[in-house]
A protein has these predicted regions:
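GST-like domain detector, emphasizing the conserved glutathione-binding G-site
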Residues: 1-129
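Residue-level detector of family-conserved "landmark" positions at structurally sensitive sites
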Residues: 31, 69, 188, 208-209
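Conserved beta-strand edge residues that scaffold enzyme active sites
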Residues: 34-36, 192, 212
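GST-like fold's C-terminal all-alpha helical module
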Residues: 103-200
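Carbohydrate-binding/catalytic loop surfaces
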Residues: 165, 212-216
């Protein structure tokens, strides 16, 4: 078995996959892809051969290449079923996917590097306007995530029950991003508590951006 992860230390999507790999105790080799240096290493010819979309993360498993973080996590869950991150029950599975997609599909694309670069370089927004944009969509998305947890009463120590799922692999990086952009996560008490429970686990600790070999 050979697992390689092309990752950027501060990428939320890469962070999700690192958490999933760690929760499953899967060893892997990290290849840093600097999204900021000289316009971004992701646009290089060499990396386009790895991932034609020029995004991170990309997982390579025994020569097979996979991108899109949720697809990667689902692949890992099906290939390495120990410590399941997606429940077997159809209702529970759909709920975990729903929570994951609130973050991966609705929040994060509006705050990723390519979006912020476009806002600054093409639309000529200043830093204050870009930060306001980021905060707006983070708050809207996490408001919805928190409302689902409050309504459904299915969360425990984590987003769905008392063991981490794919939803928590998505939530923790988003809470990190929220704090980075000046959003106080204590406005969502349940999310803050889940974040604390995750932070107590070594799988989440070792996935943290500050612990990555390409951290700056």
């Amino acid at each position: 078995m050979s697992l390689e992860l092309y990752s950027y230390w501060r990428s939320s999507a890469s962070y999700r996959v690192r958490i999933a790999l760690n929760l499953k105790s899967l060893p892997y080799v990290t290849h840093g892809v600097n999204l900021m240096k000289n316009g971004g290493d992701q646009w290089s010819v060499a990396y386009k051969e790895v991932n034609p979309q020029s995004r991170v993360p990309t997982l390579v498993h025994d020569g097979q290449r996979f991108s899109q973080s949720l697809a990667v996590i689902e692949y890992l869950d099906e290939t390495f079923p120990d410590h399941r991150l997606i429940p077997r029950d159809p209702v529970d599975r759909a709920r975990v996917r729903m929570l994951s997609q609130i973050i991966a599909c609705d929040i994060q694309p509006l705050q990723n590097t390519s979006t912020t670069v476009y806002l600054k370089e093409k639309l000529k927004l200043d830093d204050a306007a870009v930060t306001a944009w980021l905060r707006e969509w983070i708050v809207r998305g996490l408001d919805a995530y928190h409302a689902h947890l409050e309504r459904d009463h299915l969360s425990g120590k984590f987003s769905h029950g008392d063991t981490p799922t794919m939803a928590d692999c998505c939530l923790v990086p988003q809470l990190f991003a929220a704090s980075r952009f000046g959003v106080e996560v204590t406005r969502w008490p349940r999310l803050a508590l889940i974040g604390e429970n995750c932070a107590a686990m070594s799988a989440f600790q070792h996935a943290h951006p500050s612990r990555q070999p390409d951290a700056q």
